[in-house]
Structure formats: C-alpha cells, structure tokens
Regions:
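Macromolecular interaction modules
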Residues: 1-101
Length: 101
C-alpha cells in the first residue's frame, strides 16, 4: 500500500482552516481517482520532539504508480491547488510505499 501523508502546519486562523477543510477541501480530495482511504487526525496532534503539526491526513492508494497517476489527474491537481486557499501555515507532503510487518 502506498501513502500520501500531509502534515498541515498551524494556520493563522484555526477556525477558518477547520471549516474550510471540512466543508470544501475534503470533498475535493475525495474525488481523487484511485484513492482507497482518506483518514485525518482527530483532535490535537502531539510530537515527541519538535513542533507538532496542526492536522495530519493520510491518503492511501494501492501503489506508488497509483499515487503518481492520482496527483497528475485533474482532481489531484485541483486538490493540490486548493491548499493555498486554506493552509496558511503551509503543509509538508510525503509519499511512500508501506508494508505490514
């Protein structure tokens, strides 16, 4: 399984971020093709060291090829472009392949 991990940094207005993320961004991101699951952190995120992100989103796909195709799609491009509309604190995006142990 391949993952897209999004670490959203603390926004300037958390109320506006939360509202926009729930009402606008999630519906946009859920349209990304080949998306198998979409999970987000629930409540405050704690870091064992360093600064904790404000919100964590994990989008799962069957393969790295599926992530590449999804991000290249019009829906993936729309979701990426939408970040500038609400992620005032910035975001770190990581993609990786995972395996169960």
């Amino acid at each position: 399984m391949a993952q897209l991990l999004v670490l959203y940094h603390t926004p300037t207005d958390s109320v506006a971020f939360d509202r926009y993320y729930q009402e606008t961004h999630i519906p946009i991101a859920q349209k990304i093709p080949r998306l198998r699951s979409y999970r987000i952190s629930d409540g405050p995120v704690q870091a064992l060291a360093g600064t904790a992100p404000y919100l964590v989103a994990i989008l799962s796909f069957d393969s790295m090829a599926d992530i590449s195709a999804a991000l290249a799609s019009s829906e993936g491009q729309a979701a990426a472009a939408d970040l500038r509309n609400f992620a005032s604190g910035g975001a770190t995006l990581l993609i990786y392949d995972s395996k169960s142990l």
